[in-house]
Amino acid sequence: MAKQILYGEEARRSMQKGVDKLADTVKVTLGPKGRNVVLDKKFGAPLITNDGVSIAKEIELEDPYENMGAQLVKEVATKTNDVAGDGTTTATLLAQAIIREGLKNVTAGANPMLIRNGIRLAVDKTVEGLKKVSKNVNGKEDIARVASISAADPEIGKLIADAMEKVGNEGVITVEESKSMGTELDVVEGMQFDRGYLSPYMVTDQEKMEAVLDDPYILITDKKIANIQEILPLLEQIVQQGKKLLIIADDVEGEALATLVVNKLRGTFNCVAVKAPGFGDRRKDMLRDIAILTGGEVISEELGKDLKDVKVEDLGSAESVKISKENTTIVNGRGDKSAIHDRVAQIRGQIEETTSDFDREKLQERLAKLAGGVAVVKVGAASETELKERKMRIEDALAATKAAVEEGIIAGGGTAYINVLPEVRELTSDEPDVQVGINIIVKALEEPVRQIAANAGLEGSVIIEKIINSEKGIGFDALHEKYVDMLSVGIVDPTKVTRSALQNAASVASTFLTTECAVADIPEKDKPEMPGGAPGMGMGGMY
């Protein structure tokens, strides 16, 4: 396909137009008085959101050069979202500011490669300064503050803080859509997996259609049990002890299942059978997790163990097990604490090594089931449009909270960037163009406060001057339009989010400045449509 090529200033300016179109769309959402953006969807209702990355992903521009610029800045938002889960609007805004100031200097004759070096120096200094003032998240109150600011809703903040308190920092918190109007929290303590009883005759509570086993033995195997003779010696030992049994197997069918059900109905023996969770290698890992959690062994031919040789000592046990039609929950497994700890450490290592997002998510779920628990935030609203918007805000708040637990918190509302300005200004270089790069970051660091003020209908320059001349930590509360100690009133941002936003913005923007040529496809003109058939002409008698 034929290409069109733009050079130098013309190429950079065309791409900058695209950057501005995307950033100007996203930045109206910043701060407590930021507005929403409505996105048209091909199917279903339009989406109303203030999530920077969701807005950026929807933007495609007609002009190929403008679109190139927009796609580059879209990468800033996407990368920040991947790393920190929030801060995408700030990252987009910073990228726009660095590109705008950088292009002015490149046009004036500065060397973009040296400017890039200056930008890198200033960003490193800023990150160093942010880490110095960062404070650790202490307790539920700090978590609630971070989530409240991210979601712009104290109720959501409290909900996420409750969830984190119940499942711990290692726990998994998922967000689901609810059929009801309200938003509620559902916490699953212990290990839950999505497999229910194999026969409804196994239930112990007819009203709830659940089977609850107190202090049961747990047989864990990856084999299919069809012949009752295979496990008969084991069942006899368990009946003698008057205990209950949970069987987790590849499948229990035919004669074996019928025998277990008949004995349950007669009251001879209480046993529930469920299928093993997961598939393939993941199933083996999950069975091993259950075995370690309950202090049992996985009965598998791979490990040289046969069902007929199983003794009671090979079984796991737990305080209680609850089995519904769809889920099995093991509460307080009686496994060795040090073995569980070692398994958790092993999974953590795998999480760090994996490059697949899907694998990482599944490993984190396994980690949560072993180390903490699982909490589900069920989001409800009056309409589907509000539901989707609320769900996105909760997901952002959740990501911000996890980032805060990892690297701590700093003063919010762009205040932290202003607080590190004096240290960045101290950076000097004998090379004038490197100094230009440093000065670009100095100016860009003011941009978040300026935009938050603009979205509140105020003049940013006056506010920035006041913050610079105040003590560190004093910032501008745009919601109530007053100057406050940001940390003490709970206006905080996660250090990881603030750091990632600047690093990703600077990375893409400084590379953008080094562009000297842009190559794009020549848009195809619409081809004329095929002429239609003459009126009245049939298909020549063909059927």
Curated annotation (Swiss-Prot):
Residues annotated for ATP binding in this entry: T29, L30, G31, P32, D86, G87, T88, T89, T90, G413, D477, A478, L479, D493
Enzyme Commission designation: 5.6.1.7
Region (Disordered): 524-543
Top EC class, one word: isomerase
Major localization class: cytoplasm
Protein name in UniProt: Chaperonin GroEL
Superkingdom of the source species: Bacteria
Gene field: groEL
Keywords carried by this UniProt record: ATP-binding, Chaperone, Cytoplasm, Isomerase, Nucleotide-binding
Composition bias type Gly residues, residue spans: 533-543
